[in-house]
Regions:
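Flexible metal-binding regulatory segments at protein termini and peripheral loops
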Residues: 1-151, 232, 247-252, 330, ...
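Membrane-embedded alpha-helical bundles of multi-pass transporters
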Residues: 135-151, 173-174, 179, 191-199, ...
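Conserved catalytic phosphorylation-site environment of P-type ATPases
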Residues: 186-190, 226-227, 239-240, 290, ...
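Conserved cytosolic catalytic loops of P-type ATPases
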Residues: 54-60, 65-69, 78, 232-326, ...
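Cytosolic catalytic headpiece
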Residues: 1, 48, 247, 424-642, ...
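Bilayer-spanning, highly hydrophobic alpha-helical transmembrane segments
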Residues: 112-123, 348-377, 386, 390-396, ...
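Juxtamembrane helix-loop transition segments at the membrane interface in multi-pass membrane proteins
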Residues: 175-183, 218-231, 405-424, 738-753
Length: 757
């Protein structure tokens, strides 16, 4: 059988290298103060020379981690920590199992407290001003900007304290940036604050210090919010398991201590603590936390179950098949956490833009300060103030925070829906797809073919045909071989494996059974053997026109008979293909090792017009390569194991039904945890929604900056107004990014994010 044999032996071929993924990690550091892309850029410049280049570093802003990749120069832990310390941040070596979240949370709470105190002192200063002036209308003079003076000492003291408290976490970083001669937003804000103090604008200095501290607190909150969306997955699995001892007694132990092979009990309504196989009992299990399926799945003895899923109304006895740290849920969480280290193109663009934008804004501020007074004789104080406003505008807070939060939110939302995306790059790729190649068996079809007809010839019986076929296929694990074995078992036929079995790669199999040599193979193999009669040819053609796979069985004298085997198309296949086309992906191609007639029948049922059939494993790689050359951005959808070489050749590799399959999760760029083909158009729309949010945020943040540059030249903008606008922009872009976490918004398959291919 062409397809049978090709799948049986594809694992013997060497997989193509997957260069899109980050390399293995040598060292990981927990970095205090790593919150956004600007810190990433700072750390790359500081640590990159020690490890052999900036490309030897990867960053996980979500968890505040810096990774040194394999292949990096051996700099040692202490030199790296010292380099990080020179940036004003701190680093400690991190290992799996350690938890640095306590220190991070303590720092976040302390920073929030200082911010609140700074804000309270600013309000106190305003209250003192109003009280001493005796009129609320006098408060407006504070907000009028440059020109206010004559401040009484209690009010000045309140603003001075507000400034000092607001700069508590800013000054150390600003001093480090100044020493390195690499200005960052902390240095810009510090210069702006002290510049305002220099011209006796204490209210503006205090307001800028407070609002910048507020923007940093907002940044921490948004990252923590996205982090909680990921860590919430971890809480799905119970910490304890109810173990059943050999004497029948039950006791609770930590799930992390349960060995593989142990038996545990799951009562109705409880979550499963570990992956396993059902030994006794029957129940319906809600697998939505893993696969995103909304309908519970029936489980009975022999069924596979996953940690974090919810048991229905029946008790189950389960044998543990994986340790707690190796469950499907644990692997999903680990993959999602690591995914953010693989930066999306938009994240890389923002980081590069910030490197150019901030120095350019500083240069413009210097020109504004110097040129008008020198060339046109303008007042130095007025243009110095405007230069300070430009320094505030140069802070890229809203710009650098928006994209990472959007990417992390998209990763978390996808994981909740049963779609494991393994990097920011792969969040954006589905939006740009021009073509999708789908494997037939197990992807478009259920992958569980059954024997439809048994046609004996030349005086052989149906039982003899099934017995010989089962003997020849006894050692094969291919779905067609299982269909033969199931058909034989259904009729009560048991057969020992044939002797001297020889695989005819891509064609069939031969072997000796009951002292006689038999062969089994595809219609093409039958033709090559030269044993096909007109009658056999006519019948085989008729079966193939019905979309069935023909398997011939014979000996050295004649054809003993034919078996027809058919797979069934998934019920949602046609609607999924239509949804992909409606999304603008016009080229949907089916790849299969089946004969052309059978392949076209299946394709017609699925609504696919372009078919490539009778492909050997290496042919699929070539076919995908041609699609990439023709269309550019191409996804290959398969099982993640047999199709791994073809998936590696595609722009994007997507594995179907990856729940419980370690190989599929490892090899694919994106793993669909269930077999629902409708997840494909959902993925495309989700990617487009994410890109739309990122573009909206970048456009809005830059528009606010541009507007304030114009207002500054016009002499209308104030320091407090510029920083307030930046904080407001940060709040809006973060809120917009966090919309991606909304289940209601993310579930609207038909929503178009207006990002076209």
């Amino acid at each position: 059988m062409s397809e049978c044999c090709q799948h049986d032996h594809s694992h013997e071929r060497e997989e193509l290298p997957r260069t899109r993924h980050a390399g293995p990690v040598r060292l990981t550091f927990k970095v205090q103060g790593l919150d956004c892309a600007e810190e990433v850029s700072t750390l790359r410049r500081a640590v990159g020379p020690l490890v052999g280049g900036e490309d030897k570093l990867a960053f996980d802003v979500l968890n505040g981690r810096m990774m040194v990749l394999d292949g990096a120069a051996n700099a040692g832990v202490e030199p790296i920590r010292e380099a990080v310390a020179r940036t004003g941040m701190s680093a400690v070596e991190w290992r799996p199992g350690t938890d640095g979240s306590g220190e991070t949370e303590r720092r976040r709470r302390l920073q929030a407290w200082f911010t609140a105190v700074s804000g309270a002192l600013v309000l106190a200063g305003v209250a003192i001003h109003v009280w001493l002036a005796g009129s609320l209308s006098e408060a407006w003079r504070l907000f009028a900007g440059h020109g206010s003076a004559g401040m009484p000492w209690p009010e000045l003291a309140a603003y001075a304290l507000a400034t000092a408290v607001g700069l508590r976490f800013v000054l150390p970083r600003a001093w480090s940036a100044a020493k390195r001669m690499q200005p960052d937003m902390h240095l810009l804000m510090t210069v702006a604050v002290f510049g305002a103090i220099g011209i006796d604008e204490w209210f503006e200095a205090a307001t800028v210090a407070f609002l910048f501290a507020l923007s940093l607190a907002l940044e921490n909150w948004s990252v923590a919010r996205a982090r909680r969306a990921i860590s919430g997955l971890l809480n799905l699995a119970p910490t304890n398991a109810r173990i059943k001892a050999t004497d029948g007694t039950e006791r609770e132990v930590p799930a992390s201590e349960v060995p593989v092979g142990a038996h545990f009990i799951v009562r109705p309504g409880e979550r499963l603590p570990l992956d396993g196989r059902v030994l006794a009992g029957a129940s319906s299990v809600n697998q939505a936390p893993i696969t995103g399926e909304s309908i519970p799945v029936t489980k009975q003895p022999g069924s596979e179950v996953f940690a974090g899923t919810i048991n229905g109304d029946g008790a189950l006895e389960v044998e543990s098949t994986k340790a707690a740290e190796d469950t499907t849920l644990a692997r999903v969480i680990k993959m999602v956490e690591q995914a953010h280290a693989k930066r999306a193109p938009s994240e890389q663009w923002v980081e590069k833009f910030a490197r150019i934008y901030t120095p350019a804004a500083i240069a413009l501020a210097l020109l504004i300060f110097v040129v008008p007074p020198l060339v046109f004789g303008a007042a130095w104080s007025d243009w110095f103030y405007r230069a300070l406003v430009l320094l505030v505008i140069a802070c890229p807070c809203a710009l650098v925070i928006s994209t990472p939060v959007s990417i992390v939110s998209a990763l978390a939302a996808a994981a909740r829906s049963g779609v494991l995306i393994k990097g920011g790059l792969f969040v954006e790729l589905p939006a740009r797809l021009k073509a999708i190649a789908l494997d037939k068996t197990g992807t478009l079809s259920r992958g569980e073919p059954v024997v439809q007809r048994v046609l004996p010839l030349n005086r052989h019986t149906e039982e003899e045909l099934l017995e010989r076929a089962a003997a020849l296929e006894a050692r094969s694990t291919h779905p067609l071989a299982r269909a033969v074995a199931n058909a034989a078992a259904t009729r009560g036929i048991s057969a020992h494996s044939a002797a001297e079995v020889e695989i005819q790669q891509g064609k069939g199999v031969t072997g000796v059974f009951r002292g006689e040599r038999f062969w089994l193979g595809s219609h093409r193999y039958l033709e090559e053997r030269g044993q096909e009669t007109p009658e056999v040819h006519e019948r085989a053609e008729a079966f193939e026109r019905e979309g069935q796979t023909v398997v011939a069985i014979g000996n050295d004298r004649h054809v003993c008979g034919l078996l027809t085997i058919a797979d069934t198309v998934r019920p949602e296949a046609r609607s999924a293909v239509k949804a992909l086309r409606d999304a603008g992906i016009a080229h949907v191609v089916m790849l299969t090792g089946d004969n052309r007639t059978t392949a076209e029948t299946i394709a017609t049922q699925a609504g696919i017009t372009e078919v490539k059939s009778e492909l050997l494993p290496e042919d699929k790689v070539v076919a995908v390569g041609k699609l990439v050359e023709r269309y550019g951005s191409v996804a290959m959808v398969g099982d993640g194991v047999n199709d791994a070489p073809a998936m590696a050749r595609a722009t994007l590799g997507i594995a179907m039904g990856a729940a419980g399959s370690d190989a599929a999760i490892e090899t694919a760029d994106i793993a669909l945890m269930t077999d629902d083909l409708l997840k494909l158009p959902w993925l495309v729309h989700h990617s487009r929604r994410t890109l739309a949010v990122i573009r909206q945020n970048i456009t809005f943040a830059l528009s606010v900056k541009a507007a304030f540059v114009v207002l500054t030249f016009a002499g209308v903008a104030t320091l407090w107004g510029a920083i307030a606008a930046d904080v407001g922009a940060s709040l809006l872009v973060v809120t917009n990014a966090l919309r991606l976490l909304s289940p209601a918004w993310g579930s609207e398959l038909s929503e178009d994010a207006s990002v076209k291919n």
